[in-house]
Amino acid sequence: MPSLMSFGSCQWIDQGRFSRSLYRNFKTFKLHEMHGLCMPNLLLNPDIHGDRIIFVCCDDLWEHDLKSGSTRKIVSNLGVINNARFFPDGRKIAIRVMRGSSLNTADLYFYNGENGEIKRITYFSGKSTGRRMFTDVAGFDPDGNLIISTDAMQPFSSMTCLYRVENDGINFVPLNLGPATHILFADGRRVIGRNTFELPHWKGYRGGTRGKIWIEVNSGAFKKIVDMSTHVSSPVIVGHRIYFITDIDGFGQIYSTDLDGKDLRKHTSFTDYYPRHLNTDGRRILFSKGGSIYIFNPDTEKIEKIEIGDLESPEDRIISIPSKFAEDFSPLDGDLIAFVSRGQAFIQDVSGTYVLKVPEPLRIRYVRRGGDTKVAFIHGTREGDFLGIYDYRTGKAEKFEENLGNVFAMGVDRNGKFAVVANDRFEIMTVDLETGKPTVIERSREAMITDFTISDNSRFIAYGFPLKHGETDGYVMQAIHVYDMEGRKIFAATTENSHDYAPAFDADSKNLYYLSYRSLDPSPDRVVLNFSFEVVSKPFVIPLIPGSPNPTKLVPRSMTSEAGEYDLNDMYKRSSPINVDPGDYRMIIPLESSILIYSVPVHGEFAAYYQGAPEKGVLLKYDVKTRKVTEVKNNLTDLRLSADRKTVMVRKDDGKIYTFPLEKPEDERTVETDKRPLVSSIHEEFLQMYDEAWKLARDNYWNEAVAKEISERIYEKYRNLVPLCKTRYDLSNVIVEMQGEYRTSHSYEMGGTFTDKDPFRSGRIACDFKLDGDHYVVAKAYAGDYSNEGEKSPIFEYGIDPTGYLIEDIDGETVGAGSNIYRVLSEKAGTSARIRLSGKGGDKRDLMIDILDDDRFIRYRSWVEANRRYVHERSKGTIGYIHIPDMGMMGLNEFYRLFINESSYQGLIVDVRFNGGGFVSQLIIEKLMNKRIGYDNPRRGTLSPYPTNSVRGKIIAITNEYAGSDGDIFSFSFKKLGLGKLIGTRTWGGVVGITPKRRLIDGTVLTQPEFAFWFRDAGFGVENYGVDPDVEIEYAPHDYLSGKDPQIDYAIDALIEELRNWNEELPQRPS
């Protein structure tokens, strides 16, 4: 029996009185720190100097005195502090601060312990993610200068290099040692930690990007001294030994070696949590573990927990703007709408004057009209999703006990008798709204059945059924099935030879409409010889009663027979297209004398792929009588239709929700969702978010048996840390460690809402600067292809190369020893500014140029073009060069940009170093497999190869440890298919794919490894190992220092050698 919960009578809230009193009380209460109710905290990133310890707690920086036991907060309100290091003299502290809602930028500050001054040092807005920390403290040189590691001036975000900071950030001197995370000094020698960042989200990592340690030898070269089979992180030096964290024995422990990488010793035997964040004052080592701080004395091998005590318990309420976290919305009867925000459901009128919260604790996912004065909703727990009913007239709620799995789509029939839900078990089912009893209609073998509709007479359910004709088919198709509630029988509405979708019934339930990719008409590619099917969707209609006329054809009634009975047998034979040109259609809504079609114009995928930009749709109206199509609304991202088919609710690209009557679309109104602030408990939210993160991992990890064993073992272990979490970043630390227990790639946390501090901004002009006396000089200006958009420093637009020019001022503000150029540029990002340049011989230039927000792409294209020129010159015009930065849209762009020219050289280098992965490697492999077998011989002009997109001669691919995911797959495929030699270093080793489908209540995206990649010969072995090259060529720190690229040099030499024995046959015109 369903459990019945009564919440008493319903009270509508007068919005004006509520909002004023809530905000007034909140402002007063928020300032009050509840010291009497302090709870233990999560303590992170400690460092030590003498008797002073610093650490991060509640996003702020604290200091603890080991002698007195006193603790005080020393830096707060900067953003989220996640790292801090004492300078060697202990007078200053370098602090890393992350900003932006999802902590997507980071910069460094100095804190002066003598006078309390806080000063921003870097203006790089370095990339920041939960899995790697860019623009961070790398170490200190023997003179006490800070050395940072940053990706800010590099062509790749995964390439962090070392810079010495001079004059409090006025000057940054590159060390030119290549990728590095840490730098230490021992006996006057530099010790480099490459990739020695933390990997809490991937415990047990063994791939090519695992941390390694190099040391400088007497010759000025570097040698690798620590290269274990597992990851190495947080290196520090005490005496003549290097200490670090690794889990070579299966669990994270502190190990050490001597300065030659020998005499490996294990110092700890932890079994609860991994140690993290090693730091030292040269005598003792400090670290955090399980939210507490410990001190390790290498001389005595003793470990002590530092008892700091309870510090801070911020007020356990968070107030949010509902529209910022809106997840689901739905029209109800009359002027009422329902929507879900931050896991809570609300019913309100359009104006927002009256707002009613559905009285169900977190977490609600969907809410739909459930009949007169009722809504049906899906709410989730860590066990699964459940159905509930709420009567907003009486205030009574009913929650059913049947676990529906993880629900990803929900609908309710117009009469409020049953709901239809689709879950991740690939089931579509009905749920009786009286008893809560679920009945499975059908289960797919291939995918979720989320594309469904219910007829207005509540008799039929039509849905898109995913299918493949064989277990190893490459494509999942979709056919329309119809379930008859009266006969409890399934009927095929379409054949199984295409992708049929978006079924919809008309108001009298006599006709079934749907969309289909059946109108194939290829469009030519404008860059290479290729075609694509861009506008293939067309609407179709099926009369459900045999003998009934097509409702979109104006057949006189006198010429048609009387309507008979429903007969769904062989209904696919009655399908006919509607007279609308093909397009990219997503939804169809039949009305009495017209049809609404939701269409998305053809567009590029770049913004959607990299920025998550929603597709902008257009609502079209097809008039059956005139057969004309008109535009109703544009810039839409989502759409809902009311039960009576009279009102439409839409979300637009501005993120707001609007409603309008179909009879008068111009009478559009904004749904005012933000008049009532959303109030929630931080503690309750964090527990729910942890539970959901744990459940997502349990239910989506690709190996079900392994997921069950791990999930049950770790649940309580990490949930015990959640009460210590007082900020969202605290919780993030717990969640990523929990995910890391699966020891598999692609376990990420992305996005979310961590702080209200705006992201750091940076201003760029695609130039490097160096300080010459009191002035900045342009050390290098970057450009790729000067004719391409966005590929050169804006200074080049004036026809001068600014290299060597002195920068006197920017908009009249002198920059140099007394004024940081990076600060000045950051304040002008996105605008134009006048820059005064001074060259040799008194040459002065005043230039108005655009200050860029980012210049990485320019630096990337400059790097590619420099490599291409080098390859062409060194091979004397016989070898071409292509770099592929990822296997996404940018990777496709860069491949085709160069392939059409570079493939015609006798040899070809395909460089996938630093490849960020994606999914298009197979498209690129397909092109590289094309070998020339003939030529077209014109009377005039030159030869044209056949196939047109084909490789002329020999190929070599270069890969490295930063090539991962689909970059791993490309590297293995290139090698396996024998396309040429693969050289470089072992790849990242992450090939269990992801398709994130759910967000946490604050917008956080969590990914779970769902699709394990298997190769012939390698099996599942590429995961957590990588791909070994045919020839290993290391790129050592001293190679970067000397300006050499040994991997490209080897590739050129190897291709030249192969071409010695390559005989090319070209056509000779007959006489």
Curated annotation (Swiss-Prot):
Effect of R414C: Retains 50% of wild-type activity after modification of the thiol group by maleimide, which decreases the diameter of the access channel and impairs substrate access to the active site
Main location: cytoplasm
GO biological process terms on file: proteolysis
GO cellular component: cytoplasm
Region (C-2) location: 856-1061
InterPro entries named in the record: ClpP/crotonase-like_dom_sf, PD40, PDZ_sf, Tail-specific_protease, Tricorn_C1, Tricorn_PDZ, Tricorn_protease, WD40/YVTN_repeat-like_dom_sf
UniProt-annotated site: Transition state stabilizer, residues: D966
GO molecular function: serine-type peptidase activity
EC number(s) on file: 3.4.21.-
Annotated substrate binding sites: G916, G917, G918, G993, I994, T995
CDD domains: cpPDZ_Tricorn-protease (cd10828), Peptidase_S41_TRI (cd07562)
Temperature curve summary: Optimum temperature is 65 degrees Celsius.
Annotated keywords: Cytoplasm, Hydrolase, Protease, Serine protease
Renumbered residue ranges of the record's region Binds the substrate's C-terminus: 131-132
SMART domains named among the record's database cross-references: TSPc
C-1: annotated span: 679-745
Cystine bridges: none
Active-site positions on this chain: H746, S965, E1023
Effect of pH on activity: Optimum pH is 8.5-8.8.
Region PDZ-like, annotated ranges: 761-855
Effect of H746A: Loss of catalytic activity
Compartment(s) of residence: Cytoplasm
Entry function: Tricorn degrades oligopeptides (probably derived from the proteasome) and channels the products to F1, F2 and F3 proteases, which then catalyze the terminal degradation step, yielding free amino acids.
Domain notes: It is thought that substrate reaches the active site through the seven-bladed beta propeller channel, while products exit via the six-bladed beta propeller channel.
Record note on quaternary structure: Part of the Tricorn proteolytic complex. Assembles to form a hexameric toroid, 20 copies of which may then assemble to form an icosahedral supermolecule of 14.6 MDa.
Protein name per the record: Tricorn protease
Organism: Thermoplasma acidophilum (strain ATCC 25905 / DSM 1728 / JCM 9062 / NBRC 15155 / AMRC-C165)
